[in-house]
A protein has these predicted regions:
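Tandem amphipathic alpha-helical repeat scaffolds
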Residues: 1-6, 38-49, 75-86, 118-127, ...
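Amphipathic alpha-helical segments of tetratricopeptide repeats
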Residues: 2, 18-28, 60-65, 98-109, ...
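Primarily a tetratricopeptide repeat
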Residues: 8, 15, 54, 58, ...
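Short, charge-rich amphipathic alpha-helical segments embedded
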Residues: 8-40, 65-77, 101-116, 182-192
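TPR-repeat structural position
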Residues: 10, 53, 70, 90, ...
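Residues that mark the junctions of alpha-helical repeat units in TPR/alpha-solenoid scaffolds
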Residues: 32-36, 73, 146, 150, ...
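Compositionally biased, long intrinsically disordered regions
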Residues: 49, 55-62, 70-104, 169
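Amphipathic helix-loop-helix modules that constitute alpha-helical solenoid scaffolds
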Residues: 85-174, 202-212
């Protein structure tokens, strides 16, 4: 099934995974947990990639209900978010992402205003004060799995928030910068710092600052070989 998925044969992959699910023993979530979880998660993703959202929605809640820890829920949540984006249901994508982020310890205001944006902007500028690109590019690599998952989910909802809830968008970017400063850089930090630079240029008119953060984003892209963000 995974080989078929890697070959973009998503329909065949889904059939393989569903066959695997059908062959599981009785009470599989207890007696074959890892295999059962992997098959259901893979079936959820293969259905999404095949554009079969009805089948995806059959497996998605089963995975969420039966997974044993929060980090195991991240992948199915991501699939659901990406599916909402594919269906142009941006508010649903954002709602789903915020729901998981809260569980991951990253809460956001339900109705963000420009006051929230200005407060977080000031906090971000304070955290960045005295730190040039040389210091920022050499931050240690992020190792906290919960924060790494939060970074992925924030990246997943960033574009949706840009179009559907514009006051949330900068809050998401600022939070990604905060996490990078506190817990270290990931490939996604390249996106965070570069987009922060866009905000500096496009919103605040701070062209030199914005340009420097854009350069930092490119440096981190190369450092982490972040092909998905190029």
């Amino acid at each position: 099934g995974r080989k078929a998925k890697q070959s973009s044969a998503f329909k065949a992959a889904l059939e393989y995974f569903e066959t695997g699910i059908a062959l599981l023993k009785d009470d599989p979530w207890n007696v074959q947990y890892e295999l059962c979880r992997n098959l259901h998660t893979e079936a959820t993703e293969a259905a999404y990639l095949n554009g079969d959202f009805a089948t995806m929605d059959k497996y998605y809640p089963i995975v969420l209900k039966n997974t044993r820890n929060l980090l195991e829920k991240v992948k199915p949540y991501e699939i659901r978010i990406l599916a909402y984006k594919a269906e142009n249901k941006l508010l649903d994508a954002i709602k789903t992402g915020l729901e998981l982020l809260k569980q991951l310890g990253e809460d956001f205001p339900s109705n963000p205003t420009m006051v929230h944006v200005m407060v977080d902007l000031i906090k971000t500028k304070v955290k960045l004060s005295g730190k040039n690109n040389d210091k920022l590019k050499d931050l240690p690599a992020m190792t906290d799995e919960t924060k790494m998952a939060a970074m992925r989910i924030m990246a997943d909802i960033a574009s949706s928030s840009y179009w559907a809830t514009p006051t949330l968008f900068p809050l998401v970017i600022f939070r990604m910068v905060h996490l990078s400063l506190r817990y270290g850089n990931t490939a996604i930090s390249a996106f965070a710092f570069a987009t922060y630079g866009v905000i500096m240029c496009g919103v605040l008119g701070q062209m030199r600052n914005g340009y420097e953060f854009g350069k930092l984003g490119l440096i981190l892209l190369e450092k982490y070989n972040a092909k998905e963000w190029k």
